[in-house]
Amino acid sequence: MAYNVSQIKNIVNDSVKDALGANYSATKQETSDFVSLGKQLANFNAYEGFFGALANRIVRTIYFIRTYEGSSRSVLRDEHEYGAFIQKVYYDLPEAVDNPTWSIPNGVGKYVQASPYDVQAIVGVSSLIFGGKGTWSIEIVRPIEQIKSAFLEESAMMNFISGLYEAVENAFKLQEEEITNLAVNTAMASSLDGGIARNLLAEYNAKYSQSLTVATALISADFLRFASKEINRAVKNMGKMSTAFNKAGYKTFTTPDRMVVEMLSEFASATDMYLQSDTFHDELTALPNYEDVPFWQASGKDFDFNTCSSINIEHDDLDNDVSQSGIICFIHDIENVAAYFGNRRAWEIVNPRSEVVVHGEKAEKGFAVDDHANAVVFYLGSSGTVSLAEIEHGSASLSSSVAYRGNNIIVTCTPASGYHVKSVNVGDVDLEKIDNTHYAYKATDSNATITVTMEANS
């Protein structure tokens, strides 16, 4: 962290005043230069008090400077915003019911007064995924002799302060970045775990009968245009009331000003290069909460695409551990995920025997994911094949034979005369029943064999 000369003078002057207290007000010595300040401290043997005062003063100054930095990710919230995030209550939209105002029993007779206590709509309370909760702490030790030598000249004092707090501030920013990344990655894992994700590469290859790989897709203008269009279309669709874009199946919508678009930098660079002024891409980058992200969880040594686009998340509230590569974009309501890293405070302990001062800093940290809010993951991955096992006493057909996450395949069953469908499953998992002859399979990116079993009518 860099300070200018005027900042250094103000910081040190205020710190000396704090260290000397009432004694300082009784002196008339000049305190406009560092040498005089050093003499003042020496006269009152107040180096230890000065160090503590200096630490607190710098912390206050850092807070003031940090106010103008802003967050690099919209996920990071202050204490009040985070408190509001984790205390949300959701109201489920009630179904329309017949109102008895104008009703007459059986169409004849007198009006019957309806009871005001027959309303049965309930309030739904959200359940959040919490993680990363705890206290961040870092400690450093500085010899008191360093304080004395820092008063030789302004540059020495600047070096002293920078050396004292640069490591602390870097650690603070790194931890802030890590808790933010962990929050976003857990939110993506939750969406992937719930099937709220789209494999754009598999979709493109299936739709246009292509065989692009992840590598060739990133240099294909046609694919990049398709991907940008689909992401942009999802952003617009999320503006309509729907349950399609959140894991909890909650009826909600996301307006453009509340939409966060987090784009992997390598994919964003590819679209910039190959699409240039393409309308779909420009509409995405123009959104108020558009953010470029160099990597989701790790950069690796070379910032290669496979590493930067991957997440590997384990959380007790997820049904499965989630490991996914090729993630290029995460669009979500600003209420989907929040991280907090604040309530920062400092402390000092003087060890007179060793003539050192131990300086420590603490901050509260944590994050939460809300599955009631809209969130969709877009990624590039390979696809699998869906097939039917041999069927006795009937037949069946698939709406698609390509397996990729987000592809809902309809199984149409045709029992032979005198038979009906007993079960339709993949392994031990029964497929969702639509009606007596139609079933839905939510595909993954893996191969799958669907077994249809017919049973004779009784």
What are the language-model segments listed below?
Residues 1-61, 65, 283-383:
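Extended, compositionally biased alpha-helical segments that mediate assembly or anchoring
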Residues 408-434:
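Surface-exposed interfaces of beta-sheet-rich extracellular modules
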Residues 213-335:
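Extended oligomerization regions of viral-like shell subunits
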Residues 383-390, 436-458:
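Conserved "repeat-terminator" motif of extracellular CCP/Sushi domains
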Residues 384, 403-410:
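Short coil/turn motif common to extracellular beta-sandwich-like domains
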Residues 51-140:
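Assembly/oligomerization interface modules of large self-assembling protein complexes
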Residues 393-402, 429:
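Small-residue (G/S/T/A) turn/hinge positions that recur once per unit in extracellular repeat modules
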Residues 124-197, 357-361:
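Long, contiguous amphipathic alpha-helices that act as assembly "spine/axial" helices in icosahedral shell
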